[in-house]
Amino acid sequence: MAEEKQKPRMKVHYVGVIRKILQEKFHYKNEMQIPRVDKIVINMGIGEATSDSKKPSIAAGDLSLITGQKAVVTYASSSIAGFKVREGMPLGAKVTLRKDRMFEFLDRLVTIALPRVRDFRGLNPKSFDGRGNFAMGIKEHIVFPEINYDKVDQIWGMDIIVCTTAKTDDEARELLRAFNFPFRS
C-alpha cells in the first residue's frame, strides 16, 4: 500500500484558514480570484565571482541545501568593463520554487530563518512592486539551519522574491501577513 505524503503545514494553513480570511476581507466573486503564492525565486549574486570562478558553484551548492532543489549557476549576459565582467562568466546562482517545496521553504523562512537574522526589526511593508510581488534581501545565508556554520568559508547574501497572483499590493500584503510575515508597523 502506498504511503500518503504529508502536505506542507503552510499549504494546509492556506487552504483551511487564509483563503477564508482573504474572502471575508476583499469579498471576491469567484474562488479563483483569491490570491495565492505562485512561486518563490531565490537569487545569490556573488561579487567575488570575477576573481574566482568556483565561488558561484559553491554558492549553488549552499542554495541547493537551503531549498532542497538543485540551484542553477547564472552567467553574465553582457560584458561590463567597469566591473571586470565578461559575457558568459559565472556570476551567481538561483532557484525557482513552486508547489510543496515553495510552502516548505516559506515555513522555514518565517519560523526559523527570519528570527535568526541579526538586528531584525521586521520586513519593509513597502517592498512590493505594485503588482503584488514582494522582494526582500538577507545579508547572511547562514541563518538557515541547513547550512553548517563551521564548514562555511564565506558568508553570502541572497534576494528572495515572493510572486503572488494578487492584483494589488494591499491584497498581497494581507496574504503574506496571514502567512505570519513579520512586517514593520
Swiss-Prot record:
Source organism per UniProt: Bartonella bacilliformis (strain ATCC 35685 / KC583 / Herrer 020/F12,63)
Family: Belongs to the universal ribosomal protein uL5 family.
An individual GO BP term: translation
Quaternary organization: Part of the 50S ribosomal subunit; part of the 5S rRNA/L5/L18/L25 subcomplex. Contacts the 5S rRNA and the P site tRNA. Forms a bridge to the 30S subunit in the 70S ribosome.
InterPro entries tied to this protein: Ribosomal_uL5, Ribosomal_uL5_bac-type, Ribosomal_uL5_C, Ribosomal_uL5_dom_sf, Ribosomal_uL5_N
Gene Ontology MF, one: tRNA binding
Entry keyword set: Ribonucleoprotein, Ribosomal protein, RNA-binding, rRNA-binding, tRNA-binding
PANTHER family (UniProt xref): 60S RIBOSOMAL PROTEIN L11-RELATED
Keyword Oxidoreductase: no
The protein's name in its UniProt record: Large ribosomal subunit protein uL5
